[in-house]
Amino acid sequence: MAGAAGLTAEVSWKVLERRARTKRSGSVYEPLKSINLPRPDNETLWDKLDHYYRIVKSTLLLYQSPTTGLFPTKTCGGDQKAKIQDSLYCAAGAWALALAYRRIDDDKGRTHELEHSAIKCMRGILYCYMRQADKVQQFKQDPRPTTCLHSVFNVHTGDELLSYEEYGHLQINAVSLYLLYLVEMISSGLQIIYNTDEVSFIQNLVFCVERVYRVPDFGVWERGSKYNNGSTELHSSSVGLAKAALEAINGFNLFGNQGCSWSVIFVDLDAHNRNRQTLCSLLPRESRSHNTDAALLPCISYPAFALDDEVLFSQTLDKVVRKLKGKYGFKRFLRDGYRTSLEDPNRCYYKPAEIKLFDGIECEFPIFFLYMMIDGVFRGNPKQVQEYQDLLTPVLHHTTEGYPVVPKYYYVPADFVEYEKNNPGSQKRFPSNCGRDGKLFLWGQALYIIAKLLADELISPKDIDPVQRYVPLKDQRNVSMRFSNQGPLENDLVVHVALIAESQRLQVFLNTYGIQTQTPQQVEPIQIWPQQELVKAYLQLGINEKLGLSGRPDRPIGCLGTSKIYRILGKTVVCYPIIFDLSDFYMSQDVFLLIDDIKNALQFIKQYWKMHGRPLFLVLIREDNIRGSRFNPILDMLAALKKGIIGGVKVHVDRLQTLISGAVVEQLDFLRISDTEELPEFKSFEELEPPKHSKVKRQSSTPSAPELGQQPDVNISEWKDKPTHEILQKLNDCSCLASQAILLGILLKREGPNFITKEGTVSDHIERVYRRAGSQKLWLAVRYGAAFTQKFSSSIAPHITTFLVHGKQVTLGAFGHEEEVISNPLSPRVIQNIIYYKCNTHDEREAVIQQELVIHIGWIISNNPELFSGMLKIRIGWIIHAMEYELQIRGGDKPALDLYQLSPSEVKQLLLDILQPQQNGRCWLNRRQIDGSLNRTPTGFYDRVWQILERTPNGIIVAGKHLPQQPTLSDMTMYEMNFSLLVEDTLGNIDQPQYRQIVVELLMVVSIVLERNPELEFQDKVDLDRLVKEAFNEFQKDQSRLKEIEKQDDMTSFYNTPPLGKRGTCSYLTKAVMNLLLEGEVKPNNDDPCLIS
């Protein structure tokens, strides 16, 4: 009885409280509850805003934590989770209404309340993040799913929730969205960041976001790949939000109008540009498994506006709308099982093939109607705004007080699933929440406020986008470049070029040819630094000992970064690009490649320079560049620079002191030095002091040195087991640098790097041999030296990422040996370990030649992607095999040239030659060898394999690898990249390029036979090796009968046979396929003309 009385008392108290609130509804702190009453047409501005204020108070701010300021993911049931992304949109909703209230002079304190609700949330997130500063430090050095910031926190305490095993916390989109809204809100006048500790922490968040282009994450939907199996992917939406955040925060002062130089954020422009390139390469796809995704809407439209390519924007948006739009909202992505009736809520991950169950019954999310409304307002498209407002109205619900509720999703109940699958769109869907039970989807509620305020013109796009993330096409000519991703419509940039000679005697020599240069001494007090010194300076950026943050990671500075002028500790500093840096990788010592790199760098700068002021490009000329045959190409390049145009880029060559006035100056004020701080030591580029009375000579004193010095007179296999004293004696006696390098490599493995030789330690001796060989262009010795000292190019990781975002896989490892398949971007250290582990066991030089190939292919695939058409997996070891095979063909009866003796520029040209698709003058054996080594496939090949698999219940076998029909067809779709990669993986066990090409031809034959004979189907596993063997046997029978050639196991003559024609390979393959098909049952067909009774 007492319990019943207590319950009655509680109910009575709630009734009384509700009546009391109704009586004092005029208070500015308690919104009216009569929102469902009709609104008059002649509403005042106050009335309009009061309408939305009541909604915000009751559907958003009511749930904000009074301690942390965060917003819960679930509004009832005592759930303590707060997700960063949801809280950010809630803060944005309150901030948007605060911006509207700024138009009213006497707002009764509402502007202050709403602004500080947003500030409280933003600072609450910052508080949660800063408590995980150790994770930021780890993630900077090693970005992995187990070192990232958490994305879910306790709503009241800010404690981290859920372990890395329980939840996919790696959601870079959430961190990027925080940075973006931080900039937008501070730009509108809010004070969110209070001290330099917080500034240094935000700077470290920027360091984490800069490398998003190579960090696969779990994405907006927290599930990673479409299969929801715990694997991460590179997502366009994450990369796009990161790109937008970096553009917005670059050069931004976190203290707002009251800021100083210490509160400015720095962004690596080259890292940002890699994010831009990655995004443009990935789109219109969301990821490898997601053909499209609704998560792209906030990426390409509000709030990120990450695209500056209108064509790509339209293509991406059209794909999202066409494939995902429904009556109740947008599907997140196809075969999304989230909250469907068939999803098992007790399991975190799906089983293989489970996503097939969700085909056609995916939940629809009304929130994306709101995104489309906002997009329509920004783009000045009232028709789009009205279209989606009309779609939104019938799916909205209302609370008991009449407040609008945006359901999180609409689902198909279990009883109607089969009807919906049989007749898509026929069944009524039901909302996940309607507000009457206290359940609200706060992300949707916040976006509703923003969309309605914009649609009702209570705020303008410029109000909620003060940093101009979106700029209309007509205004792009005069846009401020600092905060926008759009540049001028016409990019007619002139690049400033300063020519710097290594020495005074080189300057005098070039002057005789009319080339005016300056030496490092002549540009003083301006200092010239290599980019490593600038990296050393940036190491001081963001350091905070209290938080345990070390500052900017040791990452190279790219061409955009070295095109600015820097003020460092009172000095004016300019930097030469990394392509002139001899310490990076030996390829810069090849003059022809250096000239190509200079042209490419200038074209790159012209295309992607987005700042006021002109870029400054330093061309560093070394004495070594003009020796012998290298002089004329360098002179031609310098003459082109002097004329003012090179490689299609306009340039202006002048003295450095003159060019500085029009350049961009970056003040590195974070290098402030107090009495207690130690001054960093920086080394500028020093002028070469030649011996007295010496002159620069055009011709090398030993023109035949490359021919004489290349071929070593020692063999590793012979010398590796000889005693150390014999090796040392031979080392002292031989003058061949390649032989010296080989002998030193044996000593390095046996005795270690600190073993003493005649010229010091082994490691120092190898380094000297490497330098000498580079100066003499003895490429065999250079590659030996680079391999033994494990040289690694800083550009390998970005180039591998380029492969991946162009939809390719890459394998590292020697031909005929174990290979490492790279499907996701990796850090430079991991790639270096893979290269030297996989390649050194076969041939020491393989590790460095593979790096050359990666660099060359990265450049080619960016500029001429059509050369890689039909090549899904780039197998570096196999491409090297194809190049060596090509050299054998060219050599004919003579010994083939050694690939390792060619210069890097000759290697690049050889690569371009074999990539050319037209090989009409070649015999079929050679063509199949090259195409097989390149893993080249005909157009539509993977789609045809899918069609074969549909008619092959037991799957396909080749080289012992089985491609099953199930769960392949259930898990994947025909046009999904993962299916194509699975086919490539199946073919990966084939060890002969020409045989692989025959198998590709066989699959095309099987596809055509099945297409023309719909009544036929394979009954058992299709063993492709068996079919090739049968075809070869038939070929041998014909050869024996017609040409009286004895049967043999060697298939060379078969490989050299044209595919088409009376006795082409396809005729034999077709016969083998038909024999296998006719062994099975034939499906009866009443329309068959052969059926006569």
Swiss-Prot record:
Stretches the record annotates as Calmodulin-binding: 7-29, 768-795, 920-951
The keyword Transmembrane helix belongs to this UniProt entry's keyword annotation: no
Top-rank lineage group of the source organism: Eukaryota
Single GO MF descriptor: calmodulin binding
Lipid-acceptor residues (S-farnesyl cysteine): 1090
Membrane topology annotation: Lipid-anchor
Entry's Gene Ontology cellular component terms: cytosol; phosphorylase kinase complex; plasma membrane
Its job: Phosphorylase b kinase catalyzes the phosphorylation of serine in certain substrates, including troponin I. The beta chain acts as a regulatory unit and modulates the activity of the holoenzyme in response to phosphorylation.
Protein name per Swiss-Prot or TrEMBL: Phosphorylase b kinase regulatory subunit beta
Organism: Homo sapiens (Human)
